[in-house]
Design a protein with these regions (language model features):
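N-terminal membrane topogenic signal
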Residues: 29-42
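Hydrophobic alpha-helical transmembrane segments of multi-pass inner membrane proteins, especially
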Residues: 41-47, 52-55, 62-255, 293-354, ...
């Protein structure tokens, strides 16, 4: 009827339906609704992580900076910035910056190179992983984690390379060798493992057969061990001390053994929040890679189980977002982020419990790190945005 006014929202929905009918048929995407269950778990883990960081870092903050809240305040500020980033990114269609991903990849690679340049890169605890800025120390490897997922997802979505054949995998392998090689030059083994895991996960989800990947891993494992022994005496000492951590409790095994003491003393119910003994100069940097040991000490087996269940719920929800994504690109980006969460969580807990050699992997949401928490929350924003576009059955 002439003169009839249609709501703008209805017009936009009709346009989306019309576009969906052009070309390949797709399911109708619902817009505007994020996965609130996923968001709730993220907020819960972030809050839990900040509380545990405050408890674990208070003695070190008081000793090193005469302020028990020193590490907490910095982490809290970065968490606020991360939440703002998460909210903004959750409202930007993830396809809008799809074509910018190659530029992100170039920038992140340049930053990894800059870390290796004396005067630009900062060396701490024997590793050169950070760049100094007026506000905080940036860790470029944290930026590379989501970018490698988006870059590989874009490559798969382009359809240029058939991942079912070896030739189609070569461009991905080449990119990964460059990135992982730069990170190994920084002596950042843990970051290299995580990024390689993210890349391989996206490749497998994109069509790479699993069997060749497993064969390649079995071939590379002994080569990697030989390389570690030849190039890094410190890291080889970590491997050998893993075999029998109590044989050398004053040197390479010291942190692992103190972490095991913390886990064992927690029992089932823990010593109580804030009541850890090991964080008082016994366990080095308890607010970093070994914060899970403090969780076990203060909250016991029950508290540790709650943390593990929360991470499991988050990862399962992220996989669900990947399965319901409306396109290949969104699905593979979600797979990459879910893989990062899973790899880091499993490795961190495995290191804390001396199930694998000490690699220095941070526990998401819990371990101290400004760049890490900001980047992680922005990644959660990407997943929330993908969930806005999830398809209806």
């Amino acid at each position: 009827m002439a003169g009839t006014a249609y709501p703008k929202r209805a017009i936009k929905q009709n346009r989306r339906t019309t576009r969906a009918k052009i070309g390949k048929p797709v399911k109708l995407a619902r817009m505007g609704e994020i996965d609130y269950t996923f968001l709730f778990i993220v907020i819960l883990l972030l809050s839990f992580g900040l509380v545990m960081l405050l408890s674990a870092s208070a003695p070190a903050g008081n000793t090193l900076h005469n302020n028990s809240y020193y590490f907490f305040n910095k982490q809290f500020l970065c968490a606020i910035l991360g939440l703002i980033g998460m909210w903004v990114i959750s409202r930007i269609d993830y396809n809008k910056y799809k074509n910018t991903v190659p530029k992100f990849m170039i920038v992140c690679t340049i930053l990894l190179v800059c870390v290796l340049i004396p005067g630009l890169g900062v060396k701490l605890n024997g590793s050169r992983r950070w760049l100094n800025t007026p506000f905080l120390q940036l860790q470029p490897s944290e930026f590379m984690k989501p970018v490698i997922a988006m870059y590989f997802a874009r490559l798969v979505d382009s359809g240029k390379y058939n991942l079912k054949h070896l030739k189609g995998n070569l461009p991905y392998i080449g990119v990964m060798l460059i990135v992982v090689g730069l990170m190994l030059m920084e002596t950042h083994l843990s970051g290299a493992i995580v990024i390689a895991g993210i890349g391989v996960s996206v490749m497998i989800a994109g069509g790479t057969p699993i069997k060749p990947v497993l064969i390649g891993a079995l071939i590379l494992l002994p080569i990697g061990l030989i390389g570690v022994r030849a190039l890094s005496g410190v890291r080889w000492a970590r491997v050998t001390s893993f075999m029998n951590p109590f044989a050398d409790i004053r040197d390479e095994s010291y942190q692992v053994v103190q972490g095991l003491y913390a886990i064992g003393s927690g029992g089932i119910f823990g010593l109580g929040l804030g009541q850890s003994v090991q964080k008082y100069s016994y366990l080095p940097e308890p607010y970093n890679d070994f914060i899970f040991a403090i969780i076990c000490e203060e909250l016991g087996l029950i508290g540790a189980a709650v943390v593990i269940l929360l991470f499991a719920a988050l990862i399962i929800r992220a996989i669900r977002i990947a399965m319901n994504a409306p396109d290949t690109y969104g699905s593979l980006v979600a797979v990459g982020i879910a893989a990062q969460l899973a790899i880091q969580t499993i490795l961190n807990i495995a290191v804390a419990t001396s199930s694998v050699p000490n690699t220095g992997v941070a526990l998401p949401f819990f371990s101290y790190g400004g760049t890490a928490i900001i980047t992680l929350l922005c990644e959660m924003g990407v997943l929330l945005n993908i969930s806005r576009h999830s398809v209806k059955d």
